[in-house]
C-alpha cells in the first residue's frame, strides 16, 4: 500500500513560524512518530512525504533515524493542502492503484489503524477513518443564533488516514481545479464528484496536533502507552 503524508504546514496556531511537524514530542519530532507507525505497518510499502524544500534536510534526518528498507520519498508540496496532495498523487509509483493519505500532525495513529485502512480501501473506492461525535453540535447563522441541532447519531468527526482509488482521486482533483473547488480534505472532493466514501472507525487517541495544548495531550497519551 502507498502512503502520502502531507507535511507542508506552518504551525501558526502553535505560535511559531516553523513547520510544526518538526516540533519535539518526547525527544522525537511529530513527523518521526508518524513515520514510525508507517514503518511498523504490515501493509505500507511506499511512503511519500509532501513538504517544502526548506524542510527537506530535517525530514531527511528523521528518515535516517529510522530502521527500515521501505521506500520513502520527499515530494515538493504546493501552497495549500489540496495542491500538495495533488503533487503527491503525481509522484506515486506508476503501478499504484490505491493510496492512503495521512496528516503528519496526527502523530499518534497506530500501525494497526493504518493496516485496517489499507485492507478496507481494497474493498471500496474511498474510505475515511472517523470517530462518533460525542458532543451536541449546534448549527448557527452568521449572528450566532442557533438554527439547527443535528442528530448526533449521524455525525462523525473526520480523521486520517483517508484512502482512495488513485485513478478516481486524480480525476476528482483535476475536476476540482477546473471548477475552482477549495476543500479541506480529499473525501470532500469525492463527495463533490458523487463518489461514495465509507466510514471506518478510527481511534480516539488519533488527535491532530494543532495547538500547544494538543502537544501536551499527545505527550500524556504517549507516556501512558510507552
Swiss-Prot record:
Site residues, Transition state stabilizer: 13, 20
Presence of keyword Nucleotidyltransferase: yes
Catalytic activity field: 2-C-methyl-D-erythritol 4-phosphate + CTP + H(+) = 4-CDP-2-C-methyl-D-erythritol + diphosphate
Pathway: Isoprenoid biosynthesis; isopentenyl diphosphate biosynthesis via DXP pathway; isopentenyl diphosphate from 1-deoxy-D-xylulose 5-phosphate: step 2/6
Organism: Trichodesmium erythraeum (strain IMS101)
Name of the protein described by the UniProt record: 2-C-methyl-D-erythritol 4-phosphate cytidylyltransferase
UniProt keyword list: Isoprene biosynthesis, Nucleotidyltransferase, Transferase
EC number(s) recorded for this UniProt protein: 2.7.7.60
Amino acid at each position: 500500500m502507498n502512503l502520502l503524508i502531507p507535511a507542508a504546514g506552518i504551525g501558526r496556531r502553535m505560535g511559531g513560524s516553523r513547520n510544526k511537524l518538526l516540533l519535539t514530542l518526547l525527544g522525537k519530532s511529530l513527523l518521526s512518530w508518524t513515520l514510525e507507525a508507517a514503518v511498523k505497518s504490515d501493509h505500507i510499502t511506499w511512503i511519500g512525504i509532501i513538504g517544502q524544500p526548506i524542510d527537506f534536510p530535517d525530514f531527511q534526518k528523521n528518515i535516517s533515524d529510522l530502521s527500515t528498507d521501505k521506500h520513502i520519498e520527499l515530494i515538493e508540496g504546493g501552497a495549500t493542502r489540496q495542491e500538495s496532495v495533488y503533487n503527491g498523487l503525481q509522484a506515486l509509483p506508476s503501478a499504484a492503484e490505491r493510496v492512503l493519505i495521512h496528516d503528519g500532525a496526527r502523530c499518534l495513529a497506530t500501525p494497526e489503524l493504518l493496516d485496517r485502512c489499507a485492507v478496507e480501501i481494497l474493498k471500496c473506492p474511498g474510505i475515511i477513518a472517523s470517530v462518533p461525535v460525542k458532543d451536541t453540535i449546534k448549527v448557527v447563522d452568521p449572528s450566532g443564533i442557533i438554527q439547527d441541532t443535528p442528530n448526533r447519531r449521524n455525525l462523525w468527526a473526520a480523521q486520517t488516514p483517508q484512502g482512495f482509488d488513485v485513478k478516481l482521486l486524480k480525476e476528482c482533483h483535476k475536476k476540482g481545479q477546473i471548477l475552482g473547488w477549495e476543500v479541506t480534505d480529499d473525501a470532500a472532493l469525492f463527495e463533490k464528484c458523487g463518489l461514495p466514501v465509507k466510514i471506518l472507525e478510527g481511534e480516539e487517541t488519533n488527535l491532530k496536533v494543532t495547538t500547544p495544548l494538543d502537544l501536551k495531550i499527545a505527550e500524556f497519551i504517549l507516556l501512558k502507552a510507552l
